[in-house]
Amino acid sequence: MSTSSVPSLTYFQGRGLGQFSRVLLSYLGIPYENITVTEISDALRATLPYGQLPIYRDGDFVLTQSSTIARYIAKKHNFMGKNLEEEFLVDQIVTAIHADIFPAFNNPVPEKLQKLYEKYFGSFEKKLQETGFLVGSSVTLADLYVYVGFDYIRFRGEAALSSELSDEKYPKIAELKKFFESNEGVAKYIKERPETKF
Amino acid sequence: MTKPQLSYFKVRALGQFPRVLLSYLSIDYDNNYIDKIDENIIDDLKYGQLPLYTDSNGFKLVQSMAISKYIASQHDFVGKTPEEKALVDETLAAVNIDVFTFIIRVFRGVEEKEKIQEIIIPRFFAKWNQILGEKKYLAGGNSYTLADLYVYVAYEYIGYVLPFAADLLYNGKFPHLDSLKEHFESNKGVAEYLKNRPITERKI
């Protein structure tokens, strides 16, 4: 277990559900300990509220569920929009990615997946074309989530029907990717992260 | 000012969380039952899905978990500190993304029903029962929050959709979850909602 004074994020070495918070922490320039495990040992499982990773430790405070971890960090750093309405429009997008998109490409049915991508990423692309941001008038966790989700599906390859998500089809989301990857913290994280299968 | 509106199909499923919440908080709202998504409503649906919540100020929101948190935030029902709020969020994500999705997959025959006993009950319901025994409230603190309501709805829902799960969960096996159910169902607004909710054609 970490004894560090900086927060720690524990997840498998793969990207998976750990990617959202890792990219977020890197983007916000928050020093953290990136702990990777190859499996959940019995000793580790005993410390996990639902026996699952990722887990985030901030001092004595322990949190699981990747979307919860990301929202907690984002809220602390004013990255959830400017008012209550914006906060929940961000939440709406974060939930859509976690509850609808991620489960679908883990159990893919090609025709359904194609429609799903068009529905969600089409909606995100349209919003970015109209206003430049997914919520409000500045970058929020919603933009970061769409970038990470989009990028991750492409990383997973054809098993996740990645060819559906081309730069040509979604130019504004491709710009979002460029924006985040030009951030110093994110660029450093990407350069140093290991090659993994998932 | 108009009343808030919640639009969803004439089934429990994802609409149940905000419906029970609105009833528990005694918020006067229009409970719109939708037969099918048609051109009258499709433009309001960000991802072509229900439920849809329209607040009294005209603000529209989809995704049942986002809707519930938005309503609860307006009524001081999401915990008092950033940590409590995060623990509420953690519970909601577990209910919505892990438990609810799994229940539906078992209901549709995509997932083996044995996994309810092997994974869902020990990892989630037993854990919640334990937390309630230790702390009285799921997010700690000193009052009920949306986390408690979400777990109650999931606890009631699983036995309704998967009758075999009722035998594994109810009848005193998880006394603190039973007390939670009692708390919410003795609330005047919730009791009235439960009494008046329609028997649905699809058991979902």
Curated annotation (Swiss-Prot), chain A:
Residues 5-81 form the GST N-terminal domain. One of its GO terms (biological process) is slug development involved in sorocarp development. SUPFAM superfamilies: GST C-terminal domain-like, Thioredoxin-like. One of its GO terms (molecular function) is glutathione transferase activity. Its EC number is 2.5.1.18. InterPro entries: Glutathione-S-Trfase_C-like (IPR010987), Glutathione-S-Trfase_C_sf (IPR036282), Glutathione_S-Trfase (IPR040079), Glutathione_S-Trfase_N (IPR004045), GST_C (IPR004046), GST_superfamily (IPR050213), Thioredoxin-like_sf (IPR036249). This is Putative glutathione S-transferase alpha-2.
UniProtKB/Swiss-Prot annotation, chain B:
The keyword Ubl conjugation does not apply. Residues 81-202 form the GST C-terminal domain. It comes from the Eukaryota. Disulfide bonds: none annotated. Glutathione binds at Y8, Q49, L50, Q63, S64. Keywords: Acetylation, Transferase. One of its GO terms (molecular function) is glutathione transferase activity. One of its GO terms (biological process) is glutathione metabolic process. Transmembrane segments: none annotated. It catalyses: RX + glutathione = an S-substituted glutathione + a halide anion + H(+). It is an enzyme of class 2 (transferase). The modification N-acetylthreonine is found at T2. Residues 2-79 form the GST N-terminal domain. Its EC number is 2.5.1.18. Pfam families: GST_C_3 (PF14497), GST_N (PF02798). PROSITE patterns: GST_CTER, GST_NTER. The keyword Secreted does not apply. Belongs to the GST superfamily. Alpha family. Conjugation of reduced glutathione to a wide number of exogenous and endogenous hydrophobic electrophiles. This is Putative glutathione S-transferase alpha-3.
